[in-house]
């Protein structure tokens, strides 16, 4: 069986105060990309997850183990992941892989969403990759109509950026908003994104509260954003906790033209807003 695990971007991310469990409340619009990891699943003599290029435990392996702990009876599986989503780039690659494994047990194991939330903040939204308004600490997912077709240029940067470090820096900088403000923002995002508009139509609403923290830790984030603007991107933003910077475009042709002008080997052009076939 071949399945795909699409990357995601955060079109916006509004940060709330720390919660008692140490996590942060947030309000964000997630959308899938055509960029996806490719996963081969086959029966085997034992469960194993193979992911060349990823050091240490893989979230997909944890997802498979969690399914077994909940009593999933399907025969042992070999899960081999061909990474196409840059690792540690804030594009949700590990979460996408974990969600793809969880989807294998849909209808067979109860409380899949609960397992997803235990695995990580980005996993619940990736169970059904689609434009979604995400709140809580990532576990509350409200799916929205697919947006008008558009495209992105991604500049992943290098070296990764620890989510934990970015949130800690955000706390140090005092970037969190009151919970009541998050609720008002969620209502506004639901209104502007709820009828299938392109994000370019409501770009003024798209803010990432983590951007100052990411730029503080990685000055090259700001440099990448400036480069995209100079190359003509109509709207530029940081996705998630970074370090990936995105330029938003009406179509892939415009995105490709800007990527060519940038002249960077790491630039990725892809369609946004819809998951690829085979997800």
Label the model's feature ranges.
Residues 4, 80-82, 118, 126-127, ...:
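Short beta-strand segments
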Residues 89-114, 125, 129:
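DPxDG-like acidic metal-binding loop motif
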Residues 1-89, 147-148, 156-159:
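ATP-binding N-lobe of GHMP and related small-molecule kinases
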Residues 47-49, 55, 128, 133-235, ...:
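Conserved, helical-rich catalytic subdomain that frames metal- and/or nucleotide-binding sites
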Residues 244-248:
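Short beta-strand->loop micro-motif that forms the acidic, two-metal-ion catalytic signature
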Residues 69-80, 104-121, 252-264:
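Phosphate-handling active-site elements
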Residues 39-41, 49-51, 64-67, 98-110, ...:
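Alpha-helix C-terminal capping segments
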Residues 93-94, 239-243:
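Glycine-rich beta-strand-to-loop/alpha-helix junction loops that act as flexible
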């Amino acid at each position: 069986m071949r399945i795909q695990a699409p990357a995601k971007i955060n079109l916006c991310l509004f940060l709330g105060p720390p919660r008692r469990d140490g996590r942060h409340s947030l309000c964000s619009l997630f959308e899938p990309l055509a960029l996806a990891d490719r996963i081969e699943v086959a029966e085997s003599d034992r469960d194993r997850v193979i992911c060349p290029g990823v050091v240490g435990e893989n979230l997909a392996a944890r997802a498979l183990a969690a399914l077994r702990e909940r009593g999933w009876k399907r025969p042992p599986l070999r899960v081999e992941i061909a990474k196409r989503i840059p690792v540690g780039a804030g594009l949700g690659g590990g979460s996408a892989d974990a969600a793809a494994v969880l989807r294998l047990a849909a209808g067979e194991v109860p409380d899949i969403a609960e397992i997803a939330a235990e695995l990580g903040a980005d996993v619940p939204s990736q169970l059904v990759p689609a434009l979604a308004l995400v709140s809580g600490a990532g576990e509350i997912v409200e799916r929205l109509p697919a947006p008008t077709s558009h495209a992105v240029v991604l500049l992943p940067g290098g070296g990764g950026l620890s989510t934990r470090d970015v949130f800690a820096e955000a706390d140090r900088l005092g970037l969190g908003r009151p919970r009541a403000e998050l609720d008002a923002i969620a209502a506004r995002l639901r209104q502007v994104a709820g009828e299938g508009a392109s994000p370019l139509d409501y770009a003024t609403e798209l803010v990432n509260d983590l951007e100052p923290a990411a730029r503080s830790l990685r000055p090259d984030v700001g440099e990448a954003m400036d480069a995209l603007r100079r190359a003509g991107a109509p709207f530029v933003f940081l996705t998630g906790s970074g370090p990936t910077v995105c330029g938003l475009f009406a179509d892939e042709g415009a995105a490709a033209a800007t990527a060519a002008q940038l002249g960077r080997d790491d630039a990725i052009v892809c369609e946004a807003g819809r998951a690829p076939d085979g997800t």
